[in-house]
A protein has these predicted regions:
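Conserved strand-helix element at the start of the C-terminal RecA-like helicase core
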Residues: 33-45, 118, 164-190, 196-197
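Interdomain hinge/linker at the junction between the two RecA-like core domains of SF2 helicases
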Residues: 116-165
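SF2 helicase motor core recognition
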Residues: 20, 65-67, 219-238, 252-262
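Conserved helicase ATPase core of P-loop NTP-dependent helicases/translocases
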Residues: 194-223
Length: 304
């Protein structure tokens, strides 16, 4: 019979607010062999191992199932993904969670996005834990908000803006709904003279290598796979080619811009969540962009 006192602590804070740094500081207080970090993101796990070396044990859920390593303190990073992925195509994530926490005295859940439904499910964990504590430093909010958020009239309008960007000015991030669209749009932009990097599900762990070879592409084109984990260069513009319709993922994807507090803008199809946004100013900006586009085309045809 297991009689060890078990505490569960949930720490919510915005993306890019230093949760990984907090783990590093925790390691300075505790002994290295007391901490285990479980990351559902292989790319992030690889990055942490490279950063921390043997100071902190970091594993994906799949790696843990092979090694079965236990520690007094276990930290589950990006815990919201346990609900999204553990309830669908990676059910072993829940098996890992309950088995590890059963033999740990302190269990920490780190996330930037915890929905009401997730909170209700976590409250049911009281059957396993003696105490559940929530440290809320900001949930489902952005630390660095975009300096401009433009709600586009349609996808075609956004694509027109993308295709009229200036090559090599800065790095833009384009989110597509489907992997086939990622590759087809990258081919189209490459044919127009832009440099592009792509990333779809299963490829995030190779993104760091791609960025080493080309650290400042014109466009990074991806599915939601780049909403988490992978370190990206400074992103000045984020384009959404589809309505996200999920606050958690919208927060994570939008937070890829301005990671270090720089200005960035977002052009999307969703009405922004938690941002000061004026529909009239948005309409005026759309009309202004259309006018500039019209003048540009007219000048082009006059020259030809």
């Amino acid at each position: 019979m297991h009689t060890k006192s078990q505490d569960l602590t949930i720490l919510t804070s915005p993306p890019a607010s230093g949760k990984t740094y907090w783990i590093s500081k925790l390691q300075e207080v505790l002994k290295s062999d007391q901490i285990l970090v479980i990351s559902p993101l292989r790319a992030l796990a690889d990055e942490c191992r490279e950063k921390w070396g043997e100071k902190i044990c970091v594993m994906t859920p799949e790696e843990w199932l092979v090694k079965k390593t236990f520690r007094e303190v276990v930290i589950f990073d990006e815990f919201h993904l346990f609900f999204y992925w553990g309830d669908s195509f990676r059910p072993m994530m829940w098996e890992v969670f309950f088995e590890i926490s059963l033999f740990s005295s302190q269990t920490w859940l780190l996330t930037a996005t915890l929905s009401e439904e997730m909170k209700e499910d976590i409250s049911l964990f009281s059957t396993q834990f003696d105490q559940i504590l929530w440290l809320d430093h900001g949930n489902q909010v952005l630390k660095f908000k975009p300096t401009r958020y433009l709600k586009a009239p349609d996808k075609k309008w956004i694509m027109s803006q993308i295709e009229n960007e200036i090559p090599a000015k800065d790095v833009k991030l384009v989110f597509c709904q489907y992997r086939e669209e990622v590759f087809s749009y990258a081919r189209k932009l490459t044919a127009s003279g832009f440099t592009c990097l792509t990333c779809v599900g299963g490829e995030s762990r190779f993104m760091a290598m791609k960025l080493k070879n080309n650290s400042s592409p014109d466009f990074i084109i991806s599915t939601t796979v780049l909403s988490h984990g992978v370190n990206l260069p400074d992103i000045k513009t984020i384009y959404f080619l589809y309505p996200v319709n999920n606050l958690d993922f919208w927060i994570q994807m939008t937070a890829r811009g301005g990671r270090r507090g720089q200005n960035y803008k977002v052009i999307a199809l969703d009405v922004p969540q938690g941002l000061e946004w004026n529909p009239w100013q948005n309409t005026i900006h759309i009309l202004w962009q259309n006018l500039l586009r019209f003048i540009s085309l007219k000048c082009f045809f006059l020259k030809t």
